[in-house]
């Protein structure tokens, strides 16, 4: 086995494959060629593969328990200190549909001790903690967490809070912007203190998927895993299609047992048996089946949005890059240098492409903050950024209308 092994505790994050928020309104005066589109817009999806992929997305660890248990010893941390209150505090979610009716009733009556690690173990036994797989056994008469691992859903699924804050029905494909991957990994007793300081500095909804290779830290916003059908290249910097990033994250970040190789970044990992590669087609199919959510009723001004569409296609020049039904030019083989759009160049400089992809805009309202680094907290900030960088000289009214149109996508 030849393996370049990550040195920093990688994380509970970036598992799904993609990044759909890189540059909310990119310019395209200069472009770089990339490979042709990988997915046809009219490609039909396979229902059988979708069902398989859903189980993989939600419940498959790819054998990463070896890392999360044997290396990070997170099973010890959870057993000793992670109560449901603490888990919710770092953004973990509970799938209400996995809870028996009597448990829901007891929760509603306040009869469940949410400050007890025993309750956490009970939730793990029910497979109710989104993105966490735990194996609980009775050891010397005590319930004991003996193995733990993570799945794609940890970072790329949340809940609708329909039962209580942090507890509800799964929303697969939504980025868990409450999740603090750095803080979670920093709980490990095996992570050096200097590394813990870096990880604790990322904050909720942020993760760096390359720190374990180059030692730098420029964390990214966790991307959604919905609205990807027909998009040729995934990730903020368009290294490859969905399955490329799924393999990269599953092997190098989740530390699953599988193969990944990319000579462009000098990574070559071979492990036997390969528990990742055979599952990539079904996982990809499920992710491509996840549609971007429609804007909630009443979330935008209809008349203003109608005017904003004209601004989008005209004075703001957004449609020069955010074009077609997917609102991106990546399928045309275009990428954009950081200086074109006023983006921080540091992350792009660490990648093979050295440039950013134009972000598809469907479901935009549902996943702030914006840009790869989260530097724009609102759509107003996005519009303001491009008005300054591109010297658009939009009026205040045009800016407001443009924001309302973006909310409709």
List PLM regions with ranges.
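Periplasmic c-type cytochrome electron-transfer domains
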Residues: 2-8, 23-409
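Bacterial N-terminal signal peptides
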Residues: 12-24
């Amino acid at each position: 086995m030849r393996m370049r092994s990550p040195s920093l505790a990688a994380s509970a994050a970036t598992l799904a494959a993609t990044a759909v928020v890189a540059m909310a309104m990119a310019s395209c005066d200069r472009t770089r060629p990339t490979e042709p589109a990988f997915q046809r817009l009219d490609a039909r999806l396979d229902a059988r593969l979708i069902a398989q992929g859903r189980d993989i997305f939600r419940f498959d660890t790819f054998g990463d328990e070896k890392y999360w248990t044997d290396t990070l010893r997170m099973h010890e941390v959870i057993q000793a200190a992670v109560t449901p209150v603490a888990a919710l505090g770092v953004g973990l979610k509970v799938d209400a549909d996995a809870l028996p009716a009597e448990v829901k009733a007891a929760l509603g009556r306040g009869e469940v001790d949410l400050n007890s690690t025993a309750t956490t173990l009970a939730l793990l036994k029910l497979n109710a903690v989104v993105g966490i797989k735990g194996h609980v056994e009775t050891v010397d008469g005590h319930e004991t967490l003996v193995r733990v691992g993570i799945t794609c859903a940890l970072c790329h699924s949340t809940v609708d809070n329909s039962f209580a804050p942090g507890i509800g029905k799964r929303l697969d494909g939504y980025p868990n912007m409450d999740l603090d991957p750095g803080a979670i990994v920093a709980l490990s007793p095996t992570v050096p203190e200097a590394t813990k300081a870096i990880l604790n500095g990322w904050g909720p909804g942020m993760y760096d998927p390359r720190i374990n290779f180059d030692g730098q830290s420029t964390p990214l916003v966790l991307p959604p895993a919905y609205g990807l059908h027909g998009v040729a290249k995934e990730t903020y910097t368009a290294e490859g299609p969905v399955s490329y990033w799924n393999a990269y994250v599953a092997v190098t970040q989740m530390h699953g047992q599988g193969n990944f190789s990319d000579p462009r970044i000098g990574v070559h990992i071979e492990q036997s048996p390969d528990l990742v590669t055979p599952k990539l087609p079904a996982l990809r199919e499920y992710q491509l089946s996840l549609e971007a959510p429609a804007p909630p009723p009443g979330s935008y001004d209809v008349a203003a949005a109608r005017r904003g569409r004209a601004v989008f296609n005209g004075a703001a020049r957004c449609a020069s890059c955010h074009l077609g039904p997917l609102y991106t030019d990546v399928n045309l083989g275009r990428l954009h240098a950081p200086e074109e759009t006023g983006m921080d160049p540091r992350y792009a400089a660490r990648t093979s492409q050295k440039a950013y992809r134009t972000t598809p805009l469907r479901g935009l309202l549902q996943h702030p903050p914006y840009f790869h680094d989260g530097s724009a907290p609102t759509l107003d900030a996005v519009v303001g950024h491009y008005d300054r960088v591109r010297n658009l000289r939009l009026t205040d009214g045009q800016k407001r209308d443009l924001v309302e149109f973006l909310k409709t996508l």
